[in-house]
């Protein structure tokens, strides 16, 4: 289990409170699909993913990105119990969707990039460290069913 200090929790929740989940979610998933094109195979039903502009403008990518980022909100509310929080999602992604758990780590890293671009100087090294710890812990929790 990962332990978050009071300072880390404050850094995470402070930024999260300013996050536009819909905008950042679509941007994060879109960036994942552009930068790591092999992840597109999990989104066959999303329509046109033929180019970066098609991906970033795709309404299904934006909608699912919002859903993904909303799940990060659950992580923030349950930082001390991530394994239980993501148990059902881990099972879904492992047993039904067969998603490579490495993709969770990649998405977490993309999330950190999105935060840095959205928050600039406010995204200090200390804030980045807290968020990196969170996205890593979420990736481990999502990959739990695979072990």
Curated annotation (Swiss-Prot):
Keywords of this entry: Heme, Iron, Metal-binding, Oxygen transport, Phosphoprotein, Transport
GO CC term, one of those recorded: hemoglobin complex
GO molecular function, one term: heme binding
Residues given in the record as heme b binding sites: 64, 93
Domain Globin: residue ranges: 3-147
Tissue: Red blood cells.
InterPro entries: Globin, Globin-like_sf, Globin/Proto, Hemoglobin_b, Hemoglobin_oxygen_transport
UniProt modified residues of type Phosphoserine: 14, 51
Name of a matching Pfam family: Globin
Gene Ontology biological process terms in this record: hydrogen peroxide catabolic process
Record family assignment: Belongs to the globin family.
Assembly, per entry: Heterotetramer of two alpha chains and two epsilon chains in early embryonic hemoglobin Gower-2; two zeta chains and two epsilon chains in early embryonic hemoglobin Gower-1.
Function, as annotated: The epsilon chain is a beta-type chain of early mammalian embryonic hemoglobin.
Protein name: Hemoglobin subunit epsilon
Species in which this protein is naturally found: Aotus azarae (Azara's night monkey)
